[in-house]
Protein backbone atom coordinates (compact mmCIF):
# COMPACT_ATOMS: atom_id res chain seq x y z
CA UNK A 1 0.00 0.00 0.00
CA UNK A 2 1.38 3.40 -1.00
CA UNK A 3 1.83 5.86 1.85
CA UNK A 4 2.12 9.64 1.97
CA UNK A 5 3.74 11.79 4.64
CA UNK A 6 2.13 14.93 5.99
CA UNK A 7 2.37 17.22 8.99
CA UNK A 8 -0.52 17.56 11.43
CA UNK A 9 -0.26 20.24 14.10
CA UNK A 10 3.52 20.33 13.73
CA UNK A 11 3.98 16.57 14.00
CA UNK A 12 4.96 14.49 11.00
CA UNK A 13 2.67 11.57 10.24
CA UNK A 14 1.68 9.21 7.47
CA UNK A 15 -1.47 7.93 5.83
CA UNK A 16 -2.45 5.65 2.94
CA UNK A 17 -2.80 7.24 -0.48
CA UNK A 18 -6.37 8.23 -1.30
CA UNK A 19 -7.72 8.81 2.22
CA UNK A 20 -9.37 12.06 3.25
CA UNK A 21 -7.84 14.54 5.66
CA UNK A 22 -10.38 13.44 8.26
CA UNK A 23 -9.25 9.82 7.95
CA UNK A 24 -5.59 10.86 7.96
CA UNK A 25 -6.07 12.91 11.13
CA UNK A 26 -7.89 10.11 12.93
CA UNK A 27 -5.29 7.56 11.89
CA UNK A 28 -2.69 9.83 13.47
CA UNK A 29 -4.59 10.25 16.72
CA UNK A 30 -6.18 13.64 15.99
CA UNK A 31 -9.96 13.77 16.39
CA UNK A 32 -12.06 16.30 14.49
CA UNK A 33 -15.69 17.16 15.30
CA UNK A 34 -18.30 16.08 12.75
CA UNK A 35 -22.08 15.87 12.52
CA UNK A 36 -22.87 15.12 8.87
CA UNK A 37 -20.06 12.58 8.46
CA UNK A 38 -20.62 8.93 9.32
CA UNK A 39 -18.42 6.01 8.33
CA UNK A 40 -20.27 3.89 5.79
CA UNK A 41 -22.03 6.84 4.14
CA UNK A 42 -20.74 9.03 1.31
CA UNK A 43 -19.16 12.18 2.82
CA UNK A 44 -20.74 15.49 1.78
CA UNK A 45 -18.97 18.19 3.84
CA UNK A 46 -22.23 19.82 4.92
CA UNK A 47 -21.83 20.62 8.61
CA UNK A 48 -18.44 22.40 8.20
CA UNK A 49 -17.34 21.37 11.69
CA UNK A 50 -14.30 19.46 10.41
CA UNK A 51 -12.77 22.51 8.68
CA UNK A 52 -8.97 22.58 8.85
CA UNK A 53 -6.23 24.96 7.78
CA UNK A 54 -3.85 23.69 5.11
CA UNK A 55 -0.73 25.71 4.41
CA UNK A 56 -0.97 27.30 0.97
CA UNK A 57 -4.74 26.90 0.70
CA UNK A 58 -6.72 30.09 0.19
CA UNK A 59 -9.61 28.97 2.38
CA UNK A 60 -10.46 26.55 5.15
CA UNK A 61 -11.04 23.03 3.86
CA UNK A 62 -13.61 20.45 5.02
CA UNK A 63 -11.48 17.49 6.09
CA UNK A 64 -14.12 14.85 5.32
CA UNK A 65 -14.15 15.57 1.56
CA UNK A 66 -10.57 16.77 1.00
CA UNK A 67 -8.07 14.15 -0.11
CA UNK A 68 -4.82 14.07 1.83
CA UNK A 69 -1.82 14.90 -0.34
CA UNK A 70 1.89 14.31 0.04
CA UNK A 71 3.61 17.05 2.06
CA UNK A 72 0.46 18.77 3.35
CA UNK A 73 0.92 20.89 6.48
CA UNK A 74 -2.36 20.85 8.41
CA UNK A 75 -3.59 22.72 11.47
CA UNK A 76 -6.71 21.34 13.12
CA UNK A 77 -7.29 23.23 16.38
CA UNK A 78 -6.17 26.83 15.94
CA UNK A 79 -7.99 29.66 17.68
CA UNK A 80 -9.58 30.64 14.36
CA UNK A 81 -10.89 27.12 13.75
CA UNK A 82 -12.28 26.78 17.26
CA UNK A 83 -14.16 30.08 16.84
CA UNK A 84 -15.58 28.87 13.53
CA UNK A 85 -16.75 25.61 15.08
CA UNK A 86 -18.38 27.32 18.03
CA UNK A 87 -20.13 29.76 15.71
CA UNK A 88 -21.38 26.87 13.56
CA UNK A 89 -22.87 25.14 16.59
CA UNK A 90 -24.49 28.38 17.75
CA UNK A 91 -26.06 28.83 14.32
CA UNK A 92 -27.44 25.30 14.44
CA UNK A 93 -28.90 25.94 17.89
CA UNK A 94 -30.55 29.16 16.72
CA UNK A 95 -32.23 27.62 13.67
CA UNK A 96 -34.50 25.12 15.42
CA UNK A 97 -36.15 24.41 18.75
CA UNK A 98 -33.41 22.43 20.51
CA UNK A 99 -34.77 22.06 24.04
CA UNK A 100 -32.75 19.21 25.52
CA UNK A 101 -34.85 18.77 28.66
CA UNK A 102 -37.84 17.47 26.68
CA UNK A 103 -36.00 15.67 23.87
CA UNK A 104 -35.99 11.88 23.52
CA UNK A 105 -32.30 12.06 22.56
CA UNK A 106 -31.27 13.88 25.74
CA UNK A 107 -28.02 12.23 26.80
CA UNK A 108 -27.52 10.52 23.43
CA UNK A 109 -27.41 13.59 21.17
CA UNK A 110 -24.30 14.27 19.12
CA UNK A 111 -25.16 17.96 18.78
CA UNK A 112 -25.40 18.40 22.53
CA UNK A 113 -22.21 16.38 23.09
CA UNK A 114 -20.26 18.61 20.71
CA UNK A 115 -21.66 21.74 22.34
CA UNK A 116 -20.47 20.46 25.72
CA UNK A 117 -17.09 19.51 24.28
CA UNK A 118 -16.52 22.94 22.73
CA UNK A 119 -18.04 24.94 25.58
CA UNK A 120 -21.15 26.17 23.75
CA UNK A 121 -24.00 26.65 26.23
CA UNK A 122 -26.02 29.30 24.39
CA UNK A 123 -26.33 31.03 21.02
CA UNK A 124 -25.49 34.68 20.46
CA UNK A 125 -27.79 34.68 17.43
CA UNK A 126 -31.50 35.39 17.37
CA UNK A 127 -33.57 32.24 17.59
CA UNK A 128 -35.40 31.68 14.32
CA UNK A 129 -37.68 28.69 15.05
CA UNK A 130 -39.31 28.60 11.59
CA UNK A 131 -42.88 27.51 10.98
CA UNK A 132 -42.42 23.77 10.57
CA UNK A 133 -44.81 20.89 9.87
CA UNK A 134 -46.18 19.14 12.96
CA UNK A 135 -44.44 16.08 14.37
CA UNK A 136 -45.21 13.10 12.12
CA UNK A 137 -46.08 10.04 14.21
CA UNK A 138 -48.13 8.32 11.51
CA UNK A 139 -45.45 5.65 11.02
CA UNK A 140 -45.96 2.31 12.74
CA UNK A 141 -42.61 2.44 14.55
CA UNK A 142 -40.93 5.81 14.09
CA UNK A 143 -41.54 9.52 14.52
CA UNK A 144 -40.23 12.63 12.75
CA UNK A 145 -39.74 15.91 14.64
CA UNK A 146 -38.59 18.71 12.31
CA UNK A 147 -37.77 20.91 15.31
CA UNK A 148 -34.61 18.89 16.00
CA UNK A 149 -33.27 18.62 12.44
CA UNK A 150 -29.81 19.99 11.60
CA UNK A 151 -29.95 19.07 7.88
CA UNK A 152 -27.05 16.64 8.09
CA UNK A 153 -28.83 14.28 5.60
CA UNK A 154 -27.46 11.18 7.32
CA UNK A 155 -30.93 9.63 7.35
CA UNK A 156 -31.41 10.36 3.65
CA UNK A 157 -28.07 8.84 2.69
CA UNK A 158 -28.63 5.76 4.85
CA UNK A 159 -32.06 5.20 3.30
CA UNK A 160 -30.67 5.62 -0.21
CA UNK A 161 -27.16 4.15 -0.06
CA UNK A 162 -27.60 1.38 2.51
CA UNK A 163 -31.27 0.35 2.37
CA UNK A 164 -31.83 1.38 -1.28
CA UNK A 165 -35.34 2.73 -0.67
CA UNK A 166 -34.75 6.51 -0.96
CA UNK A 167 -37.93 7.15 1.00
CA UNK A 168 -36.52 10.31 2.58
CA UNK A 169 -35.31 13.46 0.89
CA UNK A 170 -34.68 17.12 1.67
CA UNK A 171 -36.53 20.15 0.36
CA UNK A 172 -35.82 23.85 0.77
CA UNK A 173 -32.57 25.60 1.64
CA UNK A 174 -31.07 27.02 4.79
CA UNK A 175 -33.51 27.52 7.61
CA UNK A 176 -36.37 26.42 5.35
CA UNK A 177 -34.87 22.99 4.66
CA UNK A 178 -36.78 20.00 5.96
CA UNK A 179 -37.04 16.25 5.52
CA UNK A 180 -39.82 14.97 3.29
CA UNK A 181 -41.20 11.46 2.82
CA UNK A 182 -42.14 10.18 -0.65
CA UNK A 183 -42.57 13.70 -2.04
CA UNK A 184 -44.75 15.13 0.74
CA UNK A 185 -46.55 12.06 2.03
CA UNK A 186 -47.03 11.22 5.67
CA UNK A 187 -44.49 8.68 6.86
CA UNK A 188 -47.22 6.22 7.73
CA UNK A 189 -48.63 6.27 4.19
CA UNK A 190 -45.24 5.69 2.53
CA UNK A 191 -45.16 2.92 -0.07
CA UNK A 192 -41.36 2.77 -0.18
CA UNK A 193 -40.38 2.67 3.51
CA UNK A 194 -39.17 -0.80 4.52
CA UNK A 195 -39.39 -0.04 8.26
CA UNK A 196 -35.74 -1.05 8.66
CA UNK A 197 -34.95 1.72 11.16
CA UNK A 198 -31.56 2.61 9.69
CA UNK A 199 -32.56 6.27 9.36
CA UNK A 200 -33.46 6.48 13.05
CA UNK A 201 -30.21 4.88 14.14
CA UNK A 202 -28.00 7.27 12.16
CA UNK A 203 -29.82 10.47 13.20
CA UNK A 204 -27.44 12.49 15.43
CA UNK A 205 -30.26 14.32 17.24
CA UNK A 206 -33.84 13.61 18.26
CA UNK A 207 -35.27 14.36 14.82
CA UNK A 208 -36.00 10.71 14.08
CA UNK A 209 -37.02 8.62 17.05
CA UNK A 210 -38.54 5.31 18.06
CA UNK A 211 -42.19 5.71 18.98
CA UNK A 212 -42.75 5.03 22.66
CA UNK A 213 -39.37 6.44 23.71
CA UNK A 214 -39.61 9.02 26.47
CA UNK A 215 -37.14 11.75 27.39
CA UNK A 216 -33.53 10.50 27.44
CA UNK A 217 -34.48 6.94 26.41
CA UNK A 218 -33.12 6.93 22.86
CA UNK A 219 -30.27 4.52 22.25
CA UNK A 220 -28.84 4.40 18.74
CA UNK A 221 -26.31 2.15 17.05
CA UNK A 222 -24.39 3.35 13.98
CA UNK A 223 -21.62 0.75 13.73
CA UNK A 224 -23.76 -1.50 11.55
CA UNK A 225 -23.22 0.76 8.51
CA UNK A 226 -19.53 -0.07 8.25
CA UNK A 227 -20.32 -3.78 8.76
CA UNK A 228 -22.98 -3.83 6.04
CA UNK A 229 -20.94 -1.86 3.51
CA UNK A 230 -17.83 -3.92 4.21
CA UNK A 231 -19.78 -7.14 3.73
CA UNK A 232 -21.16 -5.97 0.41
CA UNK A 233 -17.77 -4.89 -0.89
CA UNK A 234 -16.21 -8.21 0.12
CA UNK A 235 -19.26 -10.11 -1.21
CA UNK A 236 -19.63 -11.85 2.15
CA UNK A 237 -23.31 -12.50 1.44
CA UNK A 238 -24.31 -14.27 -1.74
CA UNK A 239 -27.64 -12.42 -2.00
CA UNK A 240 -26.08 -8.92 -2.08
Task: Tell what function each PLM region has.
Residues 1-9:
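Eukaryote-biased recognition of intrinsically disordered, low-complexity regulatory segments
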Residues 9-11, 144-145:
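Extended, non-catalytic structural segments that build the interaction scaffolds
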Residues 12-70:
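N-terminal cofactor/phosphate-binding cores enriched in small/glycine residues
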Residues 20, 154, 198:
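Residue-level recognition of oxygen-bearing side chains
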Residues 48, 57-192, 201, 206-240:
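Fe-S ferredoxin-like electron-transfer domains
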Residues 195:
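Internal gly/pro-rich beta-alpha loop/helix module
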Amino acid sequence: MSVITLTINGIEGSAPVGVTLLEACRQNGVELPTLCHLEGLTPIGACRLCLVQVEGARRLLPACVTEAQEGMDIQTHTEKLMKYRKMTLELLLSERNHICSVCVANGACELRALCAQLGVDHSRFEYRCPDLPPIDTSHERNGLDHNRCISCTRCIRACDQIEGAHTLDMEGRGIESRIIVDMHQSWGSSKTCTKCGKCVNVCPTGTLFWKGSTVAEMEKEVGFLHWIRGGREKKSWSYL
